[in-house]
Amino acid sequence: MIKLNKLLISAFVLSASLLTGCSNENTITVCASELPHAKILNEAIKPILKEKGYNLKVTVLDWTIQNSAVANDEYDANYFQHVPYLNTNNFEGDKELIAAAKVHYEKLCLYASDKDENKKLDNGETIEIVNDESNIERALLLLSSYNILEINSSCYKKDGSFTFDTSNPNSCVTFLSGYKNCSLTCILESNLCVSLNDYNFGVIPGNTALTGLGDDYASRIVLSEKTTEETISERANIIAVKKSNKDSEKTKALVEACKDERVATYVSNTFGDSVLYHYEDLLTA
């Protein structure tokens, strides 16, 4: 009987937590990465939604489980990824997610470790890059744009899509003159900042650098991603929701709040050139 009561209590607590989350019509629940996402939500978007009669509840969650959390109705939306990542980490059927709005763009940069005080990439040095396919191509394109390496044709399938062997990254690139003996190592994104000092340099996504390198992140930047309006739009971080919730009032309110010029001002004043405000309403696109 005691065991049964415990089970019933657990079920009630779970049901109650769900009801206070996605089911509360005046509360919008969003899971997000800590920086800059949760900070933008709490400090810029939350006050705007409050004016519209909504309470925004933000939970910092590991990025690897945010899509499944929204797909399983634990949250109304998430905010951590760009469209290319969502395209390779989505669900099918009634759990499918869609991009509701683009909000900001984070520059991908090459950061120097403590090993490299002159902050200049030279021949024979080691470079760590992220190991998820949607960001590997981006890291290689950054290095290619500064004539550090060429991406071999073997990295692209016949249909033009990118493919990469994370266990043997150097087989997919050719380092150019002056960098011939450099080498790449693929590292789990959550470990990039921790392991940076094991290498000379690291190509690290913006939110990971902001969180993991702290106030020191800007002083470590060696090279920044060269951007165009097209690349910014393609890699802008999004609000993602379940496809079945596309037309919900909560989704519409959240997307509309992201458009407010106060969000743009906040992002610019808080993060400078590291994070660029870029809004696109994808619900009406």
Task: Give residue spans per PLM region.
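C-terminal motif of bacterial Sec signal peptides marking the signal peptidase cleavage site
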Residues: L18-G21
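Short, well-ordered beta-strand elements
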Residues: E25-L35, Y54-T59, T126-I127
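Short, polar/charged alpha-helical segment
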Residues: E34-K57, I65
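Short helix-initiation/N-cap motifs at beta->coil->alpha
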Residues: V58-S68, Y156-V194
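Ligand-binding "clamshell"
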Residues: T88-A100, S113-D116, D198, G212-T227
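A conserved helix-loop-strand patch within extracytoplasmic ligand-binding domains
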Residues: A100-E150, A264
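A bilobed periplasmic-binding-protein/Venus flytrap-type ligand-binding module shared by bacterial periplasmic
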Residues: K107-N118, E234-A253
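Periplasmic-binding protein-like
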Residues: N135-Y146, E256-Y279
